[in-house]
Amino acid sequence: MADNKRIVLAYSGGLDTSVAISYLKERTGKDVVAVSLDVGQGGESLETIKQRALACGAVESYVVDARDEFANEYCMKALKANAMYEGVYPLVSAISRPLISKHLVRAAHQFGADTISHGCTGKGNDQVRFEVSIASIDPTLKAISPIRDLSLTRDVEIAFAKEHKLPITQTEKSPYSIDQNVWGRAIETGFLEDPWNGPTKDCYSYTDDPAFPPVEDEVVIEFKEGVPVKIDGRDVTPLQAIEEMNRRAGAQGVGRIDLIEDRLVGIKSRELYEAPGAVALITAHQELENCCLEREQHRIKRDIDKRWGELVYDAQWFSPATQSLNAFIEDTQKYVSGEIRMVLHGGRAVVTGRRSDSSLYDYKLATYDSGDTFDQKSSNGFIDIYGLPSRVAAARDVKFGNGIEVPKNTVE
């Protein structure tokens, strides 16, 4: 019979979560199952992380290479929604939390756990994202945070690791809090908490200095129904597309973001992000939508995209509202197929060409040269009807002395 007295821990392999394994067992009396996902963050192999978890006292270690799943089911949804929270942030961390939560719940069911633990503090967004996502999938599971709920501070961690002779090699602590995956990289805390302090070179890893770029890089990205399927004529999966654009756009310094952000928990925070692949792909996707979406559909989608980004940022990935928006966004993508040519250089991703069999751009209607098929005489009647409400309202304003004033002096 499965043991229902276990805790599933979101395990990164670092000091915090390595200490948390034994600390949770000691404080709660429950065995701990460590869960680790590869979402393209780089660093140590899953096997190395698995063995460390077991050496630190985990009774089971559940590891998953989720890179393709993350790219296909999460990054592509963000791409189709042109997701940019507050106009600039491509939801680097926010879209990974629902995927991690799904695997935490799966592990809880598999190993008979009744509690899920994460390593978030009590003032960040991720605690909400994990716990709301977990509750949305299985509301019977309890969620805890050792840092928030059990007073597991860094000083306690170091002392605990020494006392219990845990197999952890402590390296010099970075002054920053960093979260990264294939969609991008988030950097915060340390001296960046003073919003007047400019970022230093050591903040960045995914991008080179845009002030000293190599020769410009021209790239052609082909989309099929909103998803990148080819780069420069070569077939790519979503994961391969993101990885290649990370390399190429990152080399040009594309995707550096520095902003004061409105957090879900109500405070403002200073955040740095690097998302070269995400920024380049979203720029290309938006331009293809400009060609392929009907005007009113496009206007509505821009509003929907903004709201989608806010909902996902605010821990609502699994909510009914987000699912409804997903259905609308997916329907808009059936004609978003074609090619976008971009130049990557000096921190910018600039579209220089676009073509699509499903484009609504009609050269014969748009041209001012011979061959123009647009009947300009039709504009007279259109303007009469379109301007009718304004003329009627203006007549009323004049009647009541509220007409728009015009300059009385004559022009010499």
Curated annotation (Swiss-Prot):
ATP binds at A10, Y11, S12, G13, G14, L15, D16, T17, S18, G119. PROSITE patterns: ARGININOSUCCIN_SYN_1 (PS00564), ARGININOSUCCIN_SYN_2 (PS00565). It is found in: Cytoplasm. Keywords: Amino-acid biosynthesis, Arginine biosynthesis, ATP-binding, Cytoplasm, Ligase, Nucleotide-binding. L-aspartate binds at T121, N125, D126. InterPro entries: Arginosuc_syn_C, Arginosuc_syn_N, Arginosuc_synth, Arginosuc_synth_CS, Arginosuc_synth_type_1_subfam, AS_cat/multimer_dom_body, Rossmann-like_a/b/a_fold. Its EC number is 6.3.4.5. Pathway: Amino-acid biosynthesis; L-arginine biosynthesis; L-arginine from L-ornithine and carbamoyl phosphate: step 2/3. GO terms for molecular function: argininosuccinate synthase activity; ATP binding. The keyword Ligase applies. The keyword ATP-binding applies. GO terms for biological process: argininosuccinate metabolic process; L-arginine biosynthetic process; urea cycle. GO terms for cellular component: cytoplasm. It catalyses: L-citrulline + L-aspartate + ATP = 2-(N(omega)-L-arginino)succinate + AMP + diphosphate + H(+). L-citrulline binds at Y89, N125, R129, S177, E261, Y273. Homotetramer. Belongs to the argininosuccinate synthase family. Type 1 subfamily. This is Argininosuccinate synthase. It comes from Bifidobacterium longum (strain NCC 2705).
